[in-house]
């Protein structure tokens, strides 16, 4: 499972209020691959959920294509044992989560056709606790294409 190698603080504030504010500022475009899976809701996604989604995608695409995981579980959520009285400190770190805001690209995929990518992303989305959508990489306009009018004027 995914987890940081070392952290400065083992126990951190939950900060759920911050999670529900606004959209993702970074990581909201497909950069490495041709297709991506974009989050539509805010959530904490656990290391196990990320791994389950990755396995679902890689099993479907078999040996073709490459998968990039664009999120990492940096935050530790703590939990106290069952039937323990209130107080006496914060519980032990139980699970590692990635803080995901709407608009964040969770996974990227390249080297497969669009139909295969869409089905692989659909299978991955079923393993996650949030609504997601399939997105394609936007073609960057090169300076040479911008001068001549680009692809829109061809034909």
UniProtKB/Swiss-Prot annotation:
GO terms for cellular component: cytosolic large ribosomal subunit. GO terms for biological process: translation. CDD domains: Ribosomal_L16_L10e. This is Large ribosomal subunit protein uL16. One of its GO terms (molecular function) is rRNA binding. Pfam families: Ribosomal_L16 (PF00252). Keywords: Ribonucleoprotein, Ribosomal protein, RNA-binding, rRNA-binding, tRNA-binding. Gene3D superfamilies: Ribosomal protein L10e/L16 (3.90.1170.10). InterPro entries: Ribosomal_uL16 (IPR047873), Ribosomal_uL16_bact-type (IPR000114), Ribosomal_uL16_CS (IPR020798), Ribosomal_uL16_dom (IPR016180), Ribosomal_uL16_sf (IPR036920). Part of the 50S ribosomal subunit. Binds 23S rRNA and is also seen to make contacts with the A and possibly P site tRNAs. NCBIfam families: rplP_bact. Belongs to the universal ribosomal protein uL16 family. The keyword tRNA-binding applies.
